[in-house]
Amino acid sequence: VFETRSFRLKGYSVLVGERPGLRAGGVWSETCVFCHNTVPYFDALWGELAGPGAPTYQGTVVDRLLPRERRWRYEVGADGDGLLQSAVAAEVAAVGGTPARDGDDRRGVLAHGIRELRSRFGARNFVEIGIGCEACHGGSREHVVDPRVHPDFAPRSAFLNARAEAGGDVTRAEQVNRVCARCHQVLFSRYPYTWEGEGRRGGKPGGSSITSGEARDFLLGGCARQMSCATCHDPHTEDRRADLDRLATTAGNAVCVRCHPQYAPAPALAAHAHHDPTGAGGSCIACHMPKKNMGLGYALTRYHRIGLPDDPARVERDRPIECALCHTDKTVADLVGKMEAWWGRKYDRAALANLYGTVDARPLQATLMRGKAHEQAVAVAVLGEARRTEALPGIARQLVNPFPLVRYYAKRAVETLADRPCAVDLDRTTPEIVAAVRACVPAAFPETVPAALPAKPRTRTDDTDED
């Protein structure tokens, strides 16, 4: 906003189709307040305690969108119902809300409380604005009284218990990751699709394609019991770009070999990765946390579900194949053939042909034409950064994508390929956008003009669930 002196679309919350006539109307207390400030953990649990069908709100714990083996269960003790309802009533009164009706059961009290919080919680209710110590460390009165008592990450309550639904002990790393996931859990807003899943409303929602969902995505992977977000990120200061970049090199493998020491020797890593162990392909993160999520600056960030690039759920459901993020010149057949030879997989060629049109297609270029919106954004960004000038016409078509966010990725890619900025207003009509881009980069639209954007204003029911 400040650099361009113009309004821009925020990366994670607006992956929705074109909606002409939409008026700005975000309410801070409803959409921002719970993640960008220090709010009692208890307030984030009301939706989970009320159960399915409860009113939704930003900042609520969303364990139901995790696989069962990753969920926590929040339970009220046998004698705790009255204490719970009294605590909810006290929170509602603190924000100036009205009490629940006499005789309401626990669910009714919680649902009423959620509506009151959504409409009334504001700046006047905070001890401090922004993220303070207790946003992560919970109530820390004992630590203030006696600094020798260290704050804890585990939730504590006289009437409420938290436990792993699958049983077993909860590790400290899991507790830390849960703290991060209170805010970094945005899934896909109204956008229904996910990575390697059935979508938001399916039985197995996968990983997010947007920024701010990193902690939830991390919980989906296999490392979240032993490794915490704080292993790579300093929660007390902004990460230095150089430090994050180093993690994506072979030097960053030192983090991974703490638990996977068998890959520390270079020959073992080469046999595992089938790449030069000293080069970019020898980085653990490069393959297991690929850059394919949409960030706020119209550049890609890393997908935080630590997994396998050869996983059939990724290869046969998602576009583009992750190996194509580096190997932009290879075809689908080239890439899956290598994965089958290297790791003993067997992929469904018919499913791949359905995704890409043909297995002889290059995954990124085919994704431009056939992909879902989040997949198209990835293809656009990668082809632009790779300077694939032959893909320019396909990238330029995304400048009139029905999803405005994808257009911004396309504009950045076109400008990267052209090596200069283009004065293009992406909120204009299709003919105006095409004319402006042709004036800047004639090769972008050599012949055909893309179809016009949707003319009918979209309504709220055109999208999926609330944010």
Predicted regions and their residues:
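Primarily the internal scaffold of c-type cytochrome electron-transfer domains
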Residues: 1-16, 41-382, 386, 405, ...
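Compact, glycine/acidic-enriched structural inserts
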Residues: 26-27
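Conserved catalytic alpha/beta cores of large enzymes that bind or transform nucleotide phosphates
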Residues: 30-43
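Amphipathic alpha-helical scaffolding segments comprising HEAT/armadillo-like alpha-solenoid repeats
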Residues: 358-367, 388-400, 419-428
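Conserved hydrophobic register position within alpha-solenoid helical repeats
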Residues: 379, 410-411
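Alpha-helical scaffold repeats of the Armadillo/HEAT/TPR superfamily
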Residues: 394, 423-447
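Hydrophobic residues within the alpha-helices of tandem HEAT/HEAT-like
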Residues: 413-419
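Eukaryotic intrinsically disordered, low-complexity regulatory tails and linkers enriched
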Residues: 447-467
